[in-house]
Amino acid sequence: MSISESYAKEIKTAFRQFTDFPIEGEQFEDFLPIIGNPTLFQKLVHTFKTHLEEKFGKEKIDFIAGIEARGLLFGPSLALALGVGFVPIRRVGKLPGECASITFTKLDHEEIFEMQVEAIPFDSNVVVVDDVLATGGTAYAAGDLIRQVGAHILEYDFVLVLDSLHGEEKLSAPIFSILHS
């Protein structure tokens, strides 16, 4: 068993499930216990870092873009480990300055995401990170913001992909996930 496989098993055991959250009929996969455990959090970042270095060794990653809310929790640590910049993708009204925005549907309501337009220079290479890929709407919206400023998405990276929801079908770049469910 590789180190990454061993780490994945440990990470999986830390997830907590909440039924009927945030809406009835949904099962919420909570990865916050991973963040609360420094050893496990280091293993999470190490797993992503190792994957990205192996896959994009010669191709420069310029930025990690973290999606609100949980991509903002581990994205900066991953960016720091890789020695690249970090860009937050936030809900409307959370970022100062000129922002690109996109409206999208999430579960049973519309949301608006924003990203500062000067945060990612034209022609940059970006990896988008978030905790869970479900239907793909949130990740698609984040990718659209990145494309609006003329940057390239190398990959979407998730801690967990809910395979039965086929969210990867909406995305325009490859995905990587530590766990699948």
Curated annotation (Swiss-Prot):
Pathway: Purine metabolism; AMP biosynthesis via salvage pathway; AMP from adenine: step 1/1. This is Adenine phosphoribosyltransferase 2. The keyword Acetylation applies. The keyword tRNA processing does not apply. Transmembrane segments: none annotated. Belongs to the purine/pyrimidine phosphoribosyltransferase family. It catalyses: AMP + diphosphate = 5-phospho-alpha-D-ribose 1-diphosphate + adenine. The modification N-acetylserine is found at S2. Catalyzes a salvage reaction resulting in the formation of AMP, that is energically less costly than de novo synthesis. May lack catalytic activity. InterPro entries: PRibTrfase_dom, PRTase-like, UPRTase/APRTase. GO terms for cellular component: cytoplasm. It is found in: Cytoplasm. It is an enzyme of class 2 (transferase). Keywords: Acetylation, Cytoplasm, Glycosyltransferase, Purine salvage, Transferase. The gene is APT2. GO terms for molecular function: adenine binding; adenine phosphoribosyltransferase activity; AMP binding. Present with 937 molecules/cell in log phase SD medium.
